[in-house]
Amino acid sequence: MKNSFNQNNYSYWIFDLDNTLYPEDDNIFSQVKMKIIKFISLKLRLDLKNADLERQRLYNLYGTSLRGLMTEYKIIPNKFLDYVHDIDLSAIIKNLDLNVALQKLKGEKYIFTNGSFKHAENVLNQLGIKDNFKSIHSIETCNYI
């Protein structure tokens, strides 16, 4: 059976950011997860084990830890996002092959992420592919849901 996929049939491309445009084994999300636990620990005065349990509870109940923190604890979302995305991105290397592949795709390209706009910009710059995207749709543009 012949593959009928033709990239020229598409006008828009939407890319997820984290663990999609760079390898999961770069351990970026594990850093974010640890920062979420530390944030909860600091703000709620919990040890790390109980902070992680609270993170999981909020995630399961609200779909994101942030939504739970906003709802139950009135946490200001930008303070949370700035804290949890203050991470080391040095494991992400410039990806020239990805840049070329993105340039070859016809149509507008967008990033969609449940991370912050600033985090998305930082990752895209680290990868060397930011200029390929028309815009970034982040957790802020989605009203933190």
Regions found by a protein language model. Give the residues of each.
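Catalytic-core regions built around general acid/base machinery
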Residues: D97-K106
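Conserved phosphate-coupling serine/threonine residues in phosphotransfer and NTP-handling enzymes
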Residues: T113-G115
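Substrate-recognition "cap/lid" segment bordering the active-site pocket of phosphatases
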Residues: F117-I145
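Short active-site oxyanion
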Residues: G107-I111
